[in-house]
Each structure stands twice: as structure tokens, then as C-alpha cells.
């Protein structure tokens, strides 16, 4: 990928630096320890995955599989009391970590949207900083119409857009979806400009190396996801001109 020499404007005045599964490179992923550490290191956004237990609780975990006594079972088939203690509920997350950050959630259970939005609202989380991600665009579009106060994110890959990126962006704009989220290797300056033309935020994930982060900030992306919060904050400070802040999206 050709490097970008001058930083192009993002739609968000101060881009979001998302700590992927908390400070995953520094602490066990998706734990309260990892999330607290990510904020101490300077991230202004946290990212996680959410599932619903058999008894209806929303919990934070990536794989959604519980291994006990040599057996693997989906979290959806296990009650909360049978989960390992390191897996927090969404209520516990807000209680321990607070609300002063952007929050990106990969929704792994399509029936979890209502509970996620309700619990976030009851915890006084600013819903304009709640970014709900899903890999199926039809699921995202459907829920966009149900929950108007939160942010919706189409998490996809360029290779999966059979209609092409311009038509996908037009579809997202038509249905009020806020964001196009792709792997960093899918983005280039032209595609970031295209997303912005359709009034979409451009999010880029899996950025682990400084030169990749630098190039994407200069492309004008609106958010980046990384396991290495220390690297991310350092590059952010150089390219944006200050440490990450909690500013609102445009």
C-alpha cells in the first residue's frame, strides 16, 4: 500500500482509538482488568464482543464457548452462574469501568440488541457513543430502524461486497447506518473519501504496527482498532497532534 504523506480530514474531529477486547496485548482479553488498563493507557474507545446466556444475561466474551469438564458448550446454552468468573456481565462492566469512552460492541447474538441498548441506557451510557457492529448488513439495517439513538456499524470485507463499495455505501446511507468498518488491508485513501462522501464514518480494524496506524490516520479514517494501546496512543499523538479525547462524532 502506498503511504499517505499528509493527513486528510476525518468526519470525527478527534478519531476514536479503540482498544480491541481491552488492552489485549497487555492483559487477558475481554476482562475488566484489560478494559481498565486500556483507559489508563489512553484509549478513548473500548471494543468487545457480546453474547446472551441461557438465562438472558449479556456477557462479554469473544469466542462464546465455555469449556468445562472436557466439553465445549455455547454461552447461549449456559446460565450465568455456570460461566467462568472472568467473564463479566454488561452491568458489571459499566459498574466497574464507567461510561466516559466510546464503546464498540460486536453483537454475536442477534437477540441481544434490546438488552444491550436497555442496559446501556439504564447505566447512563451516552448512546451516541455506543457503536453496535454486525457482519450481516441486513441485521444492521433492521436494527437501525428499531434503535434510533445508537450508532450502527456495518462490519464487512471488501471481498464480500458483491455489489461493490459505492452501492454498499449508498445502501448504508439510505437506511441511516452510521459506519463502514473494514480490515485495514481493505482501505485506501479513495475508499475513505468514498465513505465520507456518503456521510459514513470509516472504521479500520486489526492495526498492530505503527506504520499501518500512521498511514490510516493520514487517510482520514475515523476510528482504529488495535491490541497495542500504547503504540496506538503514541501514533495518535503524533498524527492527530494530541492524545485521544472523548469528543463526540460529527
Which residue ranges define each predicted feature?
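Active-site-adjacent beta->alpha loops and helix N-cap segments on the catalytic face
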Residues: 53-56, 110-115, 136-142, 164, ...
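Conserved, mostly hydrophobic/aromatic
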Residues: 20, 38, 49, 83, ...
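C-terminal active-site rim and adjoining tail of enzyme catalytic domains
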Residues: 84-87, 154-250
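Active-site beta-loop-alpha junctions enriched in small/polar residues
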Residues: 22, 51-53, 63-64, 108-110, ...
Amino acid at each position: 500500500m502506498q503511504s499517505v504523506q499528509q493527513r486528510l480530514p476525518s468526519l470525527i474531529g478527534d478519531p476514536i482509538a479503540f482498544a480491541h477486547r481491552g488492552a489485549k496485548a497487555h492483559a487477558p482479553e475481554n476482562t475488566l482488568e484489560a478494559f481498565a488498563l486500556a483507559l489508563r493507557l489512553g484509549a478513548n474507545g473500548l471494543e468487545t464482543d457480546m453474547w446472551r446466556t441461557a438465562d438472558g444475561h449479556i456477557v462479554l466474551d469473544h469466542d462464546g464457548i465455555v469449556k468445562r469438564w472436557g466439553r465445549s458448550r455455547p454461552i447461549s446454552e449456559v446460565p450465568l452462574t455456570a460461566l467462568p468468573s472472568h467473564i463479566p456481565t454488561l452491568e458489571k462492566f459499566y459498574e466497574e469501568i464507567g461510561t466516559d469512552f466510546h464503546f464498540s460492541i460486536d453483537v454475536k447474538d442477534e437477540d441481544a440488541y434490546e438488552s444491550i441498548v436497555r442496559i446501556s441506557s439504564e447505566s447512563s451510557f451516552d448512546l451516541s457513543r455506543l457503536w453496535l457492529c454486525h457482519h450481516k448488513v441486513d441485521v444492521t439495517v433492521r436494527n437501525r430502524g428499531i434503535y434510533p439513538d445508537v450508532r450502527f456499524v456495518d462490519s464487512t470485507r471488501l471481498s464480500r461486497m458483491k455489489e461493490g463499495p459505492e452501492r454498499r455505501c449508498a445502501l448504508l446511507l439510505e437506511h441511516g447506518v452510521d459506519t463502514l468498518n473494514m480490515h485495514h488491508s481493505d482501505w485506501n485513501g479513495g475508499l475513505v473519501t468514498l465513505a465520507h462522501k456518503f456521510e459514513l464514518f470509516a472504521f479500520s480494524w486489526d492495526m498492530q504496527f505503527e506504520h499501518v496506524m500512521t498511514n490510516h490516520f493520514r487517510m482520514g479514517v475515523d476510528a482504529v482498532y488495535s491490541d497495542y494501546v500504547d503504540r496506538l496512543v503514541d501514533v495518535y499523538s503524533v498524527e492527530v497532534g494530541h492524545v485521544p479525547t472523548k469528543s463526540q462524532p460529527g
